[in-house]
From Swiss-Prot:
It is an enzyme of class 5 (isomerase). GO terms for biological process: L-lyxose metabolic process; rhamnose catabolic process. Its EC number is 5.3.1.14. It comes from Enterococcus faecalis (strain ATCC 700802 / V583). This is L-rhamnose isomerase. NCBIfam families: PRK01076.1, rhaA. The lineage of its organism: Bacteria, Bacillati, Bacillota, Bacilli, Lactobacillales. HAMAP family: RhaA. Catalyzes the interconversion of L-rhamnose and L-rhamnulose. Pfam families: RhaA. Belongs to the rhamnose isomerase family. The keyword Zinc does not apply. It is found in: Cytoplasm. Its main location: cytoplasm. InterPro entries: L-rhamnose_isomerase, Rhamnose_isomerase, Xyl_isomerase-like_sf.
């Protein structure tokens, strides 16, 4: 018996004393798929064009070794997934096409993503998708689907339609439902006079996109709101209220991004209410630092509260958990590993709570037991369960994964040269 296994057996007994079955927790963890986002790997560049980022998005940093091709990106992704327990999904944006053809966003077809599907099959992964409504010449005056010019709207409507066909292709080929998430940056920098008309245009554009029947067995649509962005500080067309109304009346998933609300708001407090009314939920787990900064996810209070809400209320079955952060100041493979493993840790920690005992205490008004038990749980040997889970999934335990990443950085990343005059420091 290894030391890891021995510690697990001891921890198993400890948790059994409070009616927690660690074996059942490990089985549940095996069913949790995290949708890891591709754009951390290349600073949201993609392979459609060399245009700079726009749409209120910024990436800072110039850490060496950034992926410059789909092949390099997949190489980095394979390294990251090899250090993360379980089988998961990869979340693609439309700008991550892999083709020799020169095509625009309104011309994309499933064939332009065939290499990704082949790779996903080889690695036992699912794929999710996102139409890309930013960093493009047709992103005009801060608007896309809500632009007053019908020609601009038509371009983006066609892109939205094609994205749904691509997502359906992913689901059909891989046997896993592909979530297709819609986020548009449309908005005004300064105070508008007319807040209603742009929202009418956005609603009409979305209705046109979704007019085509797509098999929900293969793909489902999600709608993502945002409080503000760079260049849309005063008004965002796709607000939380807009997409709550739209999603609930059109049977779409509602996407909650941890950084897309006021700094004093938390999405953990929204999950229970939304679960009562919606078809389902998509989460973009992120870490906002004073604004939607998309820092790498850490094991902070809000991440743990999100996990508790999902587990305590049995919401994992109707919630798709995705990540959304990008940091070019650190090793990009390490960023993926840290963020994904932390999200898994938070979910496991929530599963190791005696939820039924706590709910019963709360129901009868025994708040003393509720407080005492939740506090004592903080000293329980959660790490021993996590380490055993990693051991059983044949991935590094503790900081051992960092040694792998550092070796990868020494051997692989130096072979990648930045184009002359370019770096990874991008602002918009």
């Amino acid at each position: 018996m290894t030391t890891i296994t021995q510690k697990y057996e001891e921890a198993k007994e400890k948790y059994a004393s409070i009616d927690v079955d660690t074996e059942a927790v490990l089985e549940k963890m095996a069913d949790v798929k995290i949708s890891m986002h591709v754009w951390q790997g290349d600073d949201v560049r993609g392979f459609l064009s060399e245009d700079e980022l726009s749409g209120g998005i910024s990436v800072t940093g110039n850490y060496p070794g950034v992926a410059r091709s789909p092949q390099q990106l997949r190489q980095d992704l394979e390294k990251a997934f090899s250090l993360i327990p379980g089988k998961h999904k990869l979340n693609l944006h439309a700008i991550y096409l892999d083709t020799e053809e020169r095509v625009d966003l309104n011309e994309l077809e499933p064939k332009h993503f065939e290499p990704w599907v082949t790779w996903a099959k080889e690695n036992g992964l699912g794929l999710d998708f996102n139409p890309t409504f930013f960093s493009h010449p047709m992103y005009r005056d801060g608007f896309t689907l809500a632009h007053p010019n019908p020609q601009v709207r038509d371009f983006w409507i066609e892109h939205g339609k094609r994205s749904r066909r691509i997502a359906e292709y992913f689901g059909r080929e891989l046997g896993q439902v592909a979530v297709n998430n819609f986020w548009v940056p449309d908005g005004f920098k300064d105070n508008p006079v007319d807040r209603l008309t742009p929202r009418k245009r956005l609603m009409a554009s979305l209705d046109e996109i979704f007019s085509e029947e797509i098999d929900p067995a293969y793909t489902v649509d999600a709608m993502e709101s945002k409080l503000f962005g760079i260049g849309s500080e005063a008004y965002t067309v796709g607000s939380h209220e807009f997409y709550m109304g739209y999603g609930l009346t059109r049977n779409k998933l509602i996407c909650l991004d941890a950084g897309h609300f006021h700094p004093t708001e938390v999405i953990s407090n929204k999950l229970s209410s939304l679960s009562l009314f919606g078809e389902g939920m998509l989460l973009h787990v992120s870490r906002p630092v004073r604004w939607d900064s998309d820092h790498v996810v850490i094991m902070d209070d809000e991440l743990q509260e999100i996990a508790k809400e999902l587990v305590r209320n049995d919401l994992l079955g109707k919630t798709h958990v995705g990540l959304d952060f990008f940091d070019a100041t650190i090793n990009r493979v390490a960023a993926w590993v840290i963020g994904t493993r932390n999200t898994q840790k938070a979910l496991m920690k929530a599963m190791l709570e005696p939820t039924n005992v706590l709910k019963e205490a709360e129901l009868i008004g025994d708040f003393t037991t509720r407080l005492a038990l939740t506090e004592e749980l903080k000293d329980f040997p959660f790490a021993d369960i996590w380490n055993y889970y990693c051991q059983e999934n044949h991935v590094p335990i503790g900081l051992d994964w960092l040694t792998d990443v550092q070796e990868y950085e020494k051997v692989i990343l130096p072979t990648r040269q930045l184009p002359t005059g370019k770096d990874s420091c991008r602002f918009s």
